[in-house]
Amino acid sequence: MLFWAAHLLLSLQLVYCWAFSCQRTESSPGFSLPGDFLLAGLFSLHGDCLQVRHRPLVTSCDRPDSFNGHGYHLFQAMRFTVEEINNSSALLPNITLGYELYDVCSESANVYATLRVLALQGPRHIEIQKDLRNHSSKVVAFIGPDNTDHAVTTAALLGPFLMPLVSYEASSVVLSAKRKFPSFLRTVPSDRHQVEVMVQLLQSFGWVWISLIGSYGDYGQLGVQALEELAVPRGICVAFKDIVPFSARVGDPRMQSMMQHLAQARTTVVVVFSNRHLARVFFRSVVLANLTGKVWVASEDWAISTYITSVTGIQGIGTVLGVAVQQRQVPGLKEFEESYVRAVTAAPSACPEGSWCSTNQLCRECHTFTTRNMPTLGAFSMSAAYRVYEAVYAVAHGLHQLLGCTSEICSRGPVYPWQLLQQIYKVNFLLHENTVAFDDNGDTLGYYDIIAWDWNGPEWTFEIIGSASLSPVHLDINKTKIQWHGKNNQVPVSVCTTDCLAGHHRVVVGSHHCCFECVPCEAGTFLNMSELHICQPCGTEEWAPKESTTCFPRTVEFLAWHEPISLVLIAANTLLLLLLVGTAGLFAWHFHTPVVRSAGGRLCFLMLGSLVAGSCSFYSFFGEPTVPACLLRQPLFSLGFAIFLSCLTIRSFQLVIIFKFSTKVPTFYRTWAQNHGAGLFVIVSSTVHLLICLTWLVMWTPRPTREYQRFPHLVILECTEVNSVGFLLAFTHNILLSISTFVCSYLGKELPENYNEAKCVTFSLLLNFVSWIAFFTMASIYQGSYLPAVNVLAGLTTLSGGFSGYFLPKCYVILCRPELNNTEHFQASIQDYTRRCGTT
């Protein structure tokens, strides 16, 4: 809306000048050429005086010391192109193109030129019409202007008429908006691509801490905005950003303040997205402030402009890299300019003060050149001239299609701007092996050169160090071609904080994400290079040490069969089983002997069988835990040992009853013997323990589990039984049985020698208590894969103690002291006990 308001205001201002001051239409030679169809060319042959105006007058362009050599070359490029097309028999064969060229040195001159071309031939005004389809003007298309600010104004004025406007230098993204600027096209790539190239250039060197300077106007301000919006999400921080004012002067307070802030920003890299006019003011201020040792990244408008390189002292500011539209040559342009200089030797005719001629179509310097002092056609101007060349050819091809031209003739009918615009959008042709075409936004795809300034003393040139293709943008840079300003030709570093060490994540300090502290990642987390601000946790099956950048697979551990400790325990358990089976065979062979009968007779086989069951449970502790193994290992051992303790308890209790209570309490003894008290106790005790185990298996079912918490780098495969309520109930029952056994054996400590088992039983129970105390102590401090081995060792010690304390002495008598295994010896022992009891 601001643009439209400005356009309307300027139009009203210019009407005053037009109506009262501009009565003559004389022009300097070379500004116009008659033809069947005319093109309007808008070029800045002079610079804007940037003066403050108090009256709505059009700026006079032809002022001393304001000549613009670059605009002159573009002016000549259009003249050359039209002449080349007119001399061609393949393009517009019987049609002659003409032109009206204008010097648009200022915004007012630009608007004035646009309105003058749109005006009707006779009355010199623009008729207000309801339908603009049949609107006709002296030209069919515009070429230019040369900057975004002027192009926005011209495009807005021409848009309602759908008058084609093909610019050769206006690159701002805003001009791609077809709803605002429907008739605008360009032969220079959009700044949308330039911004992408510049951001990728920064990324390729790792520069993430930059300053950003733009020029006043659409080109610089929109370019800076687009660059910041694209750079920040990619990890680039803008430490300082400012705009060079339109009225900036070297040494004024505004520029001094900018230089101070730029120095305080501590950035090595400064991106200058500016038109060349304000860029010159900026760099003169840089030289004055002695801001050296930096890398300056140039936008295409000034990257290879001699207007900037001519600033005194600029060769000492540091390294200059830039983005430039790919270099192209216009064959014959230089010779054309030389012939023009030789042909035009007379001075232009004088124009009355205030006439149109003195405003927009007069170039006094153009007629004073010789072939020796004419403006040098450098690479920057030649590249821009080629885009003028493309623009004129694009219009010519569109007109060729609109007129239905054959190889020999074109139809001659009325041509309306909107019709020609449609055809220009459709053009697609080769021009010196380069494709010329437009997309739906009127933009053309091209290529950029990545350049670096090169100084040889006072002589300046530039080196093409790479290129950038578009859609998508891809950079190819040869970094070895760059001569850096620092020591040892090293690539400068531009960061707020140096990169963290491996395994350290960033904690942002302040408002810029490029300024951060480095904090080490904790164990179990790692730093993913795609997210440098967060240490990510490892997966369940993974682990990581402190300060890690990756996770490692956890080692799965369990008590394997082939482990040395496993082999030792298996061998010991197998030996115990063989001893138990051998003892059972030995007792069966000597079943009717006094030793076996005094040990319990048939009850011995139940005791040996329970020990065998407990011993067999140990094999389920080895190998990877499975459901059957977890169900069997602890309950089977606990039940077997409970039966053994029940038998041992009742055997000790029964001996006490026989020797001590049979005579003192005969009624109790008879009741106990008649009701099979010993067998009933064993059955009841074993049944209680069996019910505990069944409840354990149902309510707190042991099952295989993977334990992750104990060791960060290990996964322990185990069964969930040790900490369950069922295990504690079963273990408590066995403790009670052990205490009962100890009490009963202690009561029989004075029994006959052959029946006195107090010492052996106490030894067995002592081993039982010690082994399980050791196991639980170890389990509280060690939770590794060898814990099942400790469990087996404790159980094996318990069973071995029970076997050795009760059965081993009897086996010794049977095998080694057979003379003691007879009735006479046992009777003598009983008689001796009776005599001792009688004396007391």
Swiss-Prot record:
GO cellular component: a single term: membrane
Alphabetic keyword roster: Cell membrane, G-protein coupled receptor, Glycoprotein, Membrane, Receptor, Sensory transduction, Signal, Taste, Transducer, Transmembrane, Transmembrane helix
Cited Pfam families: 7tm_3, ANF_receptor, NCD3G
Any one biological process term the GO annotation gives: sensory perception of umami taste
An example Gene Ontology molecular-function term: G protein-coupled receptor activity
Signal peptide limits: 1-19
Glycosylated sites: N86, N87, N94, N134, N290, N478, N528
Membrane-spanning ranges: 567-587, 603-623, 639-659, 680-700, 725-745, 761-781, 787-807
Annotated InterPro entries: ANF_lig-bd_rcpt, GPCR_3, GPCR_3_9-Cys_dom, GPCR_3_9-Cys_sf, GPCR_3_C, GPCR_3_Ca_sens_rcpt-rel, GPCR_3_CS, Peripla_BP_I
Compartment annotation: Cell membrane
Xref: SUPFAM superfamilies: Periplasmic binding protein-like I (SSF53822)
Bilayer disposition of the protein: Multi-pass membrane protein
Extracellular-facing ranges: 20-566, 624-638, 701-724, 782-786
Main location: membrane
Positions on the Cytoplasmic side per record topology: 588-602, 660-679, 746-760, 808-840
Subunit structure: Forms heterodimers with TAS1R3.
Protein purpose: Putative taste receptor. TAS1R1/TAS1R3 responds to the umami taste stimulus (the taste of monosodium glutamate). Sequence differences within and between species can significantly influence the selectivity and specificity of taste responses.
Family: Belongs to the G-protein coupled receptor 3 family. TAS1R subfamily.
Protein name as it appears in the record: Taste receptor type 1 member 1
